[in-house]
């Protein structure tokens, strides 16, 4: 089922349980409880930047900058940023910049 449809069905009371990404803004929006996956049925989701090799050769500084984010953003932080952008309609650039400044990765 399309992710947005899942949350619409939850909101309407049509369903009570869904599978979701732990970084979904809607988990916070609908005050949902996330069950622990103690059987590890769902693999961890970790976003990763992908570039064409040519681009990285032309902009080698990007690789170093992005590597500073490796294993830095928690699911809770990503969920909060997604919530600010998706639900509160905050500017994605500003939300990302605030995070980077808070973590000492941008000035």
Question: What is the predicted function of each stretch?
Answer:
Residues 11-20:
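Alpha-to-beta junction loops
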Residues 14-15, 26-40:
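Ligand-binding "clamshell"
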Residues 46-59:
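A bilobed periplasmic-binding-protein/Venus flytrap-type ligand-binding module shared by bacterial periplasmic
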Residues 15-16, 45-47, 62:
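A short pocket-lining beta-strand/turn micro-motif at the edge of beta-sheets
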Residues 20, 29, 44-46:
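Active-site lining segments that contact anionic ligands and/or coordinate catalytic metals
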Residues 21-23, 53:
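Short secondary-structure boundary segments
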Residues 61-107:
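Ligand-binding clefts/hinges and TM-proximal coupling segments of bilobed small-molecule sensing domains
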Residues 1-8:
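Short helix-initiation/N-cap motifs at beta->coil->alpha
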């Amino acid at each position: 089922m399309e992710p947005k449809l899942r949350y619409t069905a939850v909101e309407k009371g049509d369903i009570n349980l869904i599978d979701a990404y732990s970084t979904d803004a809607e988990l916070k929006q609908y005050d949902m409880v996330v069950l622990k996956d103690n059987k590890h049925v769902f693999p961890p989701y970790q976003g990763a930047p992908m570039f064409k090799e040519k681009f990285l050769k032309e902009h080698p500084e990007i690789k170093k900058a992005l590597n500073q984010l490796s294993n830095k953003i928690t699911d809770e932080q990503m969920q909060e940023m997604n919530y600010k952008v998706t639900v509160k309609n905050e500017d994605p650039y500003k939300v990302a910049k605030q995070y980077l400044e808070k973590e000492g990765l941008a000035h």
